[in-house]
């Protein structure tokens, strides 16, 4: 397979199916009428080879000639692609805390509805099982607390998967509930005096702690939307589904999945 040159000045987006920030990045460019070359790293092995020219092996990445921006920071993408980008408004920390708790509670509730035989089923066009998706929701919050214990957030922090003994429905539900308790304890303890304007030690660029918390909340929120979509694809109505009261005001993608057709889950079962 030939290697595509990236020295032509075209805008390229490197992404993978099911990645919340990847979907948001593509939607951002589409919304502003910016054409781009789509480079799905799960489908084209040469895509990662192109990223290696920049010393990168992560997504989402937007490149233009010999410069690049991490798609998780839209203001950097806007600068790279000559898109006007004004000030953004974030929800208060106290509200984000409530939203994250609702997301974790929802994840536990939806996991309780998942048939045991379906946990090992894979998401369409993504090597991630339904069980791993549920675990990932809780692990996003866990990565936030790791950061607060002095462990920097890396790309691999979000690529972890549970060991087999932690992949059962009961264990996954317990993990979500554990993270609700731990997050509440943190907010009632160290979180009370946290400087939310301080810089977060994250791999994707300059972010304040407030921005990192927002990323944590909407990231987990997008994946819980995917889990509800999974249930619908299995013919199961989500128990007390999360809606606008949980997601409004968060910078989430509009779509749930790159091709959000739950019937595809039924056809692939």
Regions found by a protein language model. Give the residues of each.
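Acidic/histidine-rich alpha-helical segments that form the ligand environment
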Residues: 99-111, 164-200, 207-228, 260-269
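Structural micro-motif
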Residues: 52-63, 72
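Thioredoxin-like thiol-disulfide oxidoreductase module
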Residues: 39-57, 81
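Short, contiguous alpha-helical
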Residues: 118-162, 201-262
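Short, charged, low-complexity loops and linkers
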Residues: 83-96, 164
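Alpha-helical bundle segments that constitute or directly flank the non-heme di-iron/ferroxidase center
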Residues: 91-114, 135-147, 178
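Non-catalytic, surface beta->alpha helical segment in thiol-disulfide oxidoreductase systems
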Residues: 64-87
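Local sequence-structure signature of Cys/Sec-based thiol-disulfide redox active-site neighborhoods
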Residues: 2-35
């Amino acid at each position: 397979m030939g290697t595509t040159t990236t020295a032509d000045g075209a805008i390229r987006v490197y992404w993978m199916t099911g990645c919340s920030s990847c979907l948001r990045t593509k939607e951002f460019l589409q919304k502003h009428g910016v054409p781009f070359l789509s480079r799905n790293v799960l489908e084209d092995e040469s895509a990662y080879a192109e990223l290696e020219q920049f010393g990168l092996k992560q997504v989402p990445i937007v490149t233009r000639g010999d410069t690049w921006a991490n798609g998780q920071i839209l203001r950097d993408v806007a600068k790279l692609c000559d898109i006007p980008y004004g000030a953004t408004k974030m929800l208060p920390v106290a509200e984000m805390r409530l939203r994250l708790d609702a997301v974790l509670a929802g994840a536990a509730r939806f996991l309780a509805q998942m048939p045991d035989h379906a946990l090992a089923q894979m998401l369409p066009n993504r090597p991630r099982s339904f069980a791993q998706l549920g675990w990932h929701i809780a692990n996003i919050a866990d990565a936030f607390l790791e950061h607060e214990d002095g462990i920097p957030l890396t790309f691999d922090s979000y690529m972890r998967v549970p060991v087999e003994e932690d992949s059962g429905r009961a264990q996954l539900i317990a993990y979500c509930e554990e993270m609700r308790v731990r997050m509440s304890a943190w907010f009632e303890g160290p979180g009370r005096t946290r400087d939310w304007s301080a810089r977060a030690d994250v791999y994707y660029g300059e972010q304040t702690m407030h921005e990192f918390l927002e990323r944590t909340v909407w990231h987990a929120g997008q994946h819980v939307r995917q889990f509800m979509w999974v249930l619908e694809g299995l013919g199961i109505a989500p128990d007390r589904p999360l809606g606008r009261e949980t997601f409004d005001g968060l910078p989430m993608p509009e779509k749930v999945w790159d091709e959000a057709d739950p019937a595809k889950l039924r056809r692939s079962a």
